[in-house]
Amino acid sequence: MEIPILSELKLKGIEPEVIFWVGCAGSFDDRAKKVTKSFVKILNNANVSYAVLGNEESCSGDPAKRSGNEFIYQMQAISNIELLNSYNVKKIVTTCPHCFNTLKNEYPSLGGSYEVMHHSEFINTLLRENRIKISGGSFKGKKITYHDSCYLGRANKIYEAPRDIIKELDIDLVEMKNAKSNGLCCGAGG
């Protein structure tokens, strides 16, 4: 699977539409790596002009901030912001709710102002623009539920984009007792 690296595109004078911020989990956690690969397939199928930072990407700093180490957080964040600004990045998409929240809501106070989207929002946009299509396939007639992550849901009020995508699968979306703003934390940090 070929994944464009921002520094290489810049050397060729190519400005990608969006930067895919992979994040620590998306790079190292086996389960999250599957999400990363699947999202890259979607980007490629939709002919999205995108790039990743590759070896230049560092942790967003969220774990340091959440564990109370503001110094380490700011060092990581400022380093990332300087890198992103040096590339004149305007739009970032990420699959990680923690990275999403940090890049969108915390980086601006340190000089990093970007349009930041969660991949569910980005995929939903691709669907609305007819850049990708989903066929119901083997999901027809099945029931599914969706868990709202803390940082995507309650922290950023993104509830409908994931559900809109699920509805495209031609399945029966069944809401949990505690959903959306009443959702419960899964305990896994996302």
Located regions from the model:
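Iron-sulfur cluster-binding electron-transfer modules in prokaryotic oxidoreductases
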Residues: 1-190
